[in-house]
Amino acid sequence: MKSFNPKSILIIGMAGGLARITAHLLSKKYPDIPMIGIDSRKIKNDFHLKNLEIIQMNYSRGNFEKLFRDKNFDVVLHLGRMSHVSTNPGFNLRKRLNLNIMGTSRILDLSLRFKIKKVIVLSTFHVYGALPDNATFLKEDAPLRGSFNYPELRDVVEMDQMATNWMWKNQNKIQTVVLRPCNIIGPQIKNVITKYLTSATIPTPMDFNPMFQFIHEYDMANVITESIRNVPTGTYNVANNDVISIREAKEIASNSPQYSLPLFIVGPMAKALNKTFLNIPEYIFDYIKFACVINGDQIDTHFDKRPIRYSSREALELLTLE
């Protein structure tokens, strides 16, 4: 792959914690390169970065097209996938489908039309699904079975498939990288697994104790930053080499002893709490039942120095210090 120095960067999903950290790393690495961060959600503008402009806008075709036309981007970071834990409870499956799938389609089409040099799309390891016959360490060519049992993962799987198909179709015209990280955790990441790990209310399953992988938010932002220059077109898992059981992970993250119950009790218990304040989707209980561990060796071959600093255990320990 012929590396290049970016001249202008668009960050989509700027209200998210990962995008915020990535913007800081990019500003440090490329202090003279203009960056624009956009989001349809309200963005807390406390960055104090001279080369970053913040814009709140709806993800409509007209808004996107004007932005791409007016600004001469050569790198697009699509970090704006709407997760299942949203600050807006009105984001149901239909709205997520529109934002994640249709929004991604617009971004990719405009990137090709306006001759963007590189696009990085943030996906997730959830696309593989947590099933009893999963391989020990899933590689990038493993089937995407995440939505087999849970329709709420449909948008995640379809977005990944669409981005991957588009990537190979246009590989001679534009560099595209699809990242499938393991569980991202950190003080600025408000996702499903963080809610589960830090909840003192939801117990661990007595009858299951699968292995998990965790990556610290700073490390994931560093992977994204370094991928701009170093990682060629392709789909890549992003994960630590170490694993840790869900019981031990929850004990570390909550900084307190845990109690366990049979899974058939844990699930209904969480559903009842979801109606009040917890908002943990049902699919997470397959992930605390069956392991979904990924192999992240492929992306490491493209880095002179591995951008992941913290182990899974260290990432969990850092979560308790914040």
Task: Label each residue range with its predicted role.
Residues 155-158, 189-193, 205-228, 233-234:
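Substrate-positioning beta->alpha
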Residues 148-177:
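Active-site Tyr-X1-5-Lys
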Residues 217, 245-251, 272-306:
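Conserved C-terminal active-site "lid" loop/helix of NAD(P)H-dependent oxidoreductases
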Residues 4, 8-29:
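N-terminal Rossmann NAD(P)H-binding glycine-rich loop of SDR-like oxidoreductase domains
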Residues 221-281, 319:
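Mid/C-terminal beta-alpha module of Rossmann-like enzyme folds, strongest
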Residues 2, 298-300, 306-322:
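Amphipathic terminal alpha-helices
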